[in-house]
Amino acid sequence: MIDDNIENNEQTINDIAEEIVEKANPEITELKAEIEELKDRLIRTTAEIDNTRKRLEKARDEAKDYAIATFAKELLNVSDNLSRALAHKPANSDIEVTNIIAGVQMTKDELDKIFHRHHIEEIKPEIGSMFDYNLHNAISQIEHPDHEPNSIITLMQSGYKIRDRLLRPATVQVAKKS
């Protein structure tokens, strides 16, 4: 009789255990699915955070590089005027004029150094080079037998860019078919 009780108790324990496992299996499956979903969300969120960080770093770098663009555009005319003044210096002049010209040259050189330090580059196309609408602004087309069509025949004003961004296109005249 004790053996029967033990067997009945064992059977009852086994039945209860099976019942618990049967009830727990869907919960375990559900919890495993939830864990997988959470892992997937974590991976996606981590990737999104990483992409956002990269975008912000790029935006910060661009802002730093191009923050001076508006100010630099205004200085371009100063550089042009200094170049024009130096291009028209008199051949024979007294000491005062020579000193003024030297001062203008030093100012132009210092401005060029500042431009270089801030990655501002002059666009000065060669005569005869081909017109590039990304860098040049054609103000006129002139028939010219010595030049290919769309080649630059006159540089009217230098252009400038800061890194890869155009500040001002070079103003040119281009040849057209005759």
From Swiss-Prot:
Q: Which UniProt keywords apply?
A: Chaperone, Cytoplasm, Stress response
Q: Is Chaperone included in the keywords of this UniProt record?
A: yes
Which is a Pfam family this sequence falls into?
Answer: GrpE
**What domain of life does the native source organism fall in?**
Bacteria
Q: Which InterPro entries match?
A: GrpE, GrpE_coiled_coil, GrpE_head
Where is the protein situated, by its record's location annotation?
Cytoplasm
* One Gene Ontology term of the molecular function aspect: unfolded protein binding
Any one Gene Ontology biological process term? protein import into mitochondrial matrix
**Which GO CC annotations does the UniProt entry carry?**
cytoplasm
Q: Subunit comment for this entry?
A: Homodimer.
Its job: Participates actively in the response to hyperosmotic and heat shock by preventing the aggregation of stress-denatured proteins, in association with DnaK and GrpE. It is the nucleotide exchange factor for DnaK and may function as a thermosensor. Unfolded proteins bind initially to DnaJ; upon interaction with the DnaJ-bound protein, DnaK hydrolyzes its bound ATP, resulting in the formation of a stable complex. GrpE releases ADP from DnaK; ATP binding to DnaK triggers the release of the substrate protein, thus completing the reaction cycle.
NCBIfam families assigned: PRK14161.1
What family does this belong to? Answer: Belongs to the GrpE family.
User: What is this protein's name?
Assistant: Protein GrpE
> What species is given as this protein's source?
Rickettsia akari (strain Hartford)
Give the source lineage, highest ranks first: Bacteria, Pseudomonadati, Pseudomonadota, Alphaproteobacteria, Rickettsiales
Instruction: Name the gene for this chain.
Output: grpE
